[in-house]
């Protein structure tokens, strides 16, 4: 009986407090949490945005470009994700990596009726290099301590219930 109690306790520790990877295409969990120094990009007014200012929040960095068809496809669902109830500790940064002017990026958002997200820029592709991006869209998810724990390579439907429930575990 004592052995059974210990076994059940160990199962609870190993399985009861972890979030399993949902069956979501393109989602890759990071085996070792990654910490990056100097994660800085620009807002629409060309002011620096530093991720360290957002410690304590679940962060999503979505790298996109106006010429990217899959980016255009997923952006409305990313916009909706920012407004999901129960994810009030989530901050999403859609970061344009093409070397375009603000007007073109704003037109892209207006054309897609994006209302919950602001536009950010990595025109010098400093972050794209730092994160070793291979293409767009790529989404990087950081925990509340600023450590990368997941990536999405390619597009997904951010409105997917399995994805939202998985994200709520970290919120």
Which residues does each PLM region occupy?
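Sec-dependent N-terminal signal peptides
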Residues: 4-13
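Sec/Tat signal peptide C-region and signal peptidase I cleavage site
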Residues: 14-18
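N-terminal "domain-start" segment that seeds a small globular fold
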Residues: 19-51
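Short active-site neighborhood of thiol/selenol oxidoreductases, capturing the structured segment around
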Residues: 50-72
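Active-site acidic short loop of glycosyltransferases
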Residues: 54-57, 87, 114-116, 133
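Structural microenvironment flanking redox-active thiols in thiol-disulfide oxidoreductases
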Residues: 73-112, 123-129
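Thiol/disulfide oxidoreductase modules built on the thioredoxin-like
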Residues: 107-115, 122-166
């Amino acid at each position: 009986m004592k052995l059974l109690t210990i076994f059940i306790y160990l199962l609870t520790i190993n399985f009861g407090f972890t979030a399993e990877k949902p069956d979501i295409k393109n989602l890759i969990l990071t085996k070792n949490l990654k910490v990056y120094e100097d994660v800085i990009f620009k807002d629409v007014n060309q002011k620096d945005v530093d991720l360290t200012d957002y410690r304590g929040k679940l962060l999503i960095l979505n790298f996109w470009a106006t010429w990217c068809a899959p980016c255009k496809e997923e952006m409305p669902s990313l916009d909706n994700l920012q407004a999901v109830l129960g994810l009030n500790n989530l901050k999403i940064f859609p970061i344009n990596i093409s070397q375009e002017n603000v007007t073109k990026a704003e037109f892209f958002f207006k054309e897609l009726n994006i209302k919950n997200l602001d536009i950010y820029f990595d025109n010098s592709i400093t972050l794209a290099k730092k994160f070793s991006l291979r293409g767009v869209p790529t989404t990087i998810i950081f925990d509340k301590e600023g450590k990368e724990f997941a990536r999405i390579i390619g597009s997904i439907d951010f409105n997917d219930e399995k994805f939202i429930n998985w994200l709520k575990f970290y919120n």
